[in-house]
A protein has these predicted regions:
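Hydrophobic transmembrane alpha-helices
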Residues: 201-268, 290-293
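Extended, charged/polar low-complexity intrinsically disordered regions
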Residues: 354-422, 426, 430, 436-437, ...
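Rossmann-like NAD(P)-binding element
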Residues: 516, 537-581
């Protein structure tokens, strides 16, 4: 909201909500699931406002004869859906460009607060549909407009260049008067780093005034009998395009356009021109045409220079210091990336175990239905793509996503193909000049690349350091174990479980008894211990032994079945040491801890998307390990059998501002 919200600042349906998930982070998974379902219901309620009009217009269109159909009303619903899709495409393209492009204009941090403030970007599309339906019902002549009338195109163009642009310019200057600015326009200007949807983030009263201006050409066309469905909706498309262009925060308007037609400089603004309005505030007030800024002397003198610099791009911006290589978990996770739905990316995803999907709520099912066609197209892609770019002090950090899903990593048939994509991503990271590469989720699976060691074996001279993050992840697990614990139960698989070995070794060094039920895991872990610590590692022959029943701390791997959970005594702590949540929660009297993670330093910039199921500004320990590696300047790999050192990694992480994180609660 504005700093001092004025009358009619709230949108009428604000309490119903829009297509958004909650930003609240619940510790109780059952409450999290109910909250997500509630937000999905809110989405349905807000868009249900359009439903009666849409049903009525469709019914009338079908029942009417070919010469009596109300084309304008019938087109409202498909145009609404197309505008939603078009807006989302702009969000995706803009975020992709600002993560990788040298042509980014404002190089400042975008945070979760801005994402929350701009969650209602679809309100203006919903309002447009409602107003179109209302005017169509109130003005009979609007019910008989044709598909096309070229005269309306001329009317719309002249009225936009004249009254609309002129009135908007002076209205905009008035909104920068301290009285109106504090009550209305400051809400829009709270976003210094703009995104395409920033263009439509205004209080309701301010948006109504803008709609009144944009209605001048539309109502004039209706009144003069020159209106048509194509021109009316084409005018909306023009407004959307110019709005999103001006706020996309990367320069894409080619110089050739202005060289071929120099007057275009006064008829079309550029992203860099409007960005100055958001950084300087007292210049570049024009809507889409800088003509009036030049006429009244408010054009920023640095506009041309900024345009040239943004078009040329920043030298050296392409080389990241640290690349984190992750992958998709499910098709729906595609929409939860930073490049997907902004509000979903800013909220933790439902926990998904390695061996199955997470939530089965109606909202998750709907997301999966939307994502499946996109997932099918993405299956043809054989290159990892940039999803996120962050900064910490002087480090440039990037997150790359392998376009493959957890199920494909677990499939013997698909593992070879996945391996080729991951290996190419590793080669691309080195070619980009990255100093450190971290392997997230199953990108470091033993059966895929032996915790990254395969790439070092194939290229011993590799300059980029491969970091699997085992040391820091083990340290994070140790921090979650309650103080005073003298024994733990270690569960997991034996197959290449480096994490279990490092963790057990650290526990035995601290003289904590480690009980292992699985014989193969016991033998695997024992080989990684110093002989003098073997006495602290015990093999339990049976699940129902006294030690298994009474141990209060369970260290669990990728899978924790309901049957296993029921064997624990009340009050037991389940502490995952895997990158994936181990499974569904079935005990109400036990404590379930987070997967190993750290809270990022306050200086960490441009973080506005959650990492999978972790909450805001929390990062998996494996990802954080690479950043610490680069900050410390360590010139060694941590992959395969190589280990940085648990205590060494933990001390370094804390020294650089990372903080322990442990989300847990009794269910």
């Amino acid at each position: 909201m504005a700093s001092k919200p004025g009358p009619l600042s709230r949108w009428p349906w604000q309490d119903l909500g829009n297509y958004k998930e909650t930003q609240l982070i619940m510790v109780d998974e059952r409450r999290r699931r109910r909250t997500r379902n509630g937000c999905f219901l809110h989405c349905m309620l807000s868009y249900a406002l359009v439903a009666p009009w849409a049903v009525r217009s469709t019914y009338r269109f079908v029942r009417s004869g070919s010469g009596e159909r109300d084309l304008l009303a019938f087109a409202v619903l498909p145009v609404l859906l197309l505008r939603l899709l078009y807006s989302q495409l702009w969000i995706t393209v803009s975020r992709h460009q600002t993560a990788r492009s040298r042509h980014r204009i404002v190089n400042k941090s975008l945070d979760f607060e801005q994402v929350d403030r701009e969650r209602n970007w679809d309100d203006q599309i919903l309002l447009t549909a409602l107003l179109f339906y209302a005017v169509n019902a109130a003005v009979p002549v609007a019910q008989s407009v044709p598909w096309w009338d070229s005269r309306g195109l001329l009317v719309a163009a002249l009225l936009h260049v004249g009254p609309v642009e002129f009135l908007y310019y002076w209205l905009h200057r008035a909104l920068h008067h301290h009285y109106l600015y504090a009550r209305y326009h400051s809400h829009h200007h709270a976003s210094i780093v703009t995104e395409p949807i920033t263009s439509v983030i205004h209080p309701f009263a301010e948006e109504l005034v803008y709609f009144t201006l944009f209605a001048i050409p539309l109502l004039t066309m209706v009144g003069t009998g020159t209106a048509s469905v194509a021109v009316a909706n084409g005018y909306l498309a023009y407004i959307d395009f110019m709005n999103y262009l001006g706020h996309c925060n990367f320069e894409l308007v080619p110089r050739l356009l202005f060289d071929v037609f120099p007057p275009l400089k006064y008829l079309m603004y550029t992203p860099s021109f409007h960005s100055l309005h958001h950084t300087q505030f007292r210049s570049n007030y024009s809507l889409f045409m800088p003509l009036y800024d030049h006429l009244y002397g408010t054009a920023d003198k640095s506009s041309d220079d900024l345009y040239e610099r943004a078009l040329q791009g920043r030298a050296g911006e392409d080389a990241p210091d640290v690349v984190h290589l992750t992958h998709l978990t499910t098709p729906a996770s595609l929409l939860r990336l930073r490049l997907g739905f902004a509000s979903l990316a800013a909220a933790p995803a439902p926990p998904a175990s390695r061996y199955g999907a997470g939530s089965s709520s109606s909202s998750s099912s709907s997301l999966a239905a939307v994502a499946c066609p996109l997932a099918a197209l993405l299956g043809w892609t054989r290159t990892a793509f940039r999803s996120e770019a962050n900064r910490l002090h002087k480090l440039k950090l990037e997150t790359w996503v392998v376009p493959r899903y957890t199920s494909q990593y677990l499939s013997k048939q698909g593992l070879y193909a996945v391996g080729r994509v991951v290996e190419k991503a590793v080669a691309d990271a080195e070619a980009s000049g990255a100093r450190v590469l971290t392997l997230g989720l199953l990108n470091q699976a033993n059966e895929l690349n032996k915790n990254g060691e395969l790439y070092v074996i194939r290229k011993p001279s590799m300059r980029t350091k491969i970091v699997d993050g085992t040391s820091l992840a083990a340290a994070a697990v140790l921090h979650m174990i309650p103080e005073g614990t003298d024994e733990v139960l270690l569960l997991g698989d034996a197959g290449g479980n480096k994490m279990a070995g490092v963790l057990a070794s650290a526990l035995c060094e601290r003289e904590i008894q480690v009980h292992v039920v699985d014989k193969d895991l016991y033998e695997s872990v024992k080989q990684q211990l110093r002989p003098e610590t073997h006495e602290h590692l015990l093999h339990l022959a049976e699940w129902w032994s006294h030690s298994a029943k009474t141990t209060k701390v369970w260290l669990v791997g990728d899978r924790l079945t309901g049957e296993e959970q029921r064997r624990a005594q009340g009050g037991a702590h389940f502490v995952p040491y895997s990158q994936f949540p181990p499974g569904a929660v079935v005990r109400a009297d036990c404590v379930y801890h987070s997967t190993p993670a750290l809270v990022v330093p306050d200086a960490f910039e441009d973080l506005h998307a959650c990492e999978n199921w972790l909450p805001r500004r929390v990062m998996s320990a494996w990802r954080a390990a690479g950043i610490v590696h680069a900050l410390e300047g360590w010139d060694a790999h941590e992959c395969g059998a190589r280990v940085t050192g648990v205590d060494k990694a933990w001390r370094a992480a804390l020294a650089h501002g990372f903080r322990p994180y442990d989300r847990y609660g009794a269910n």
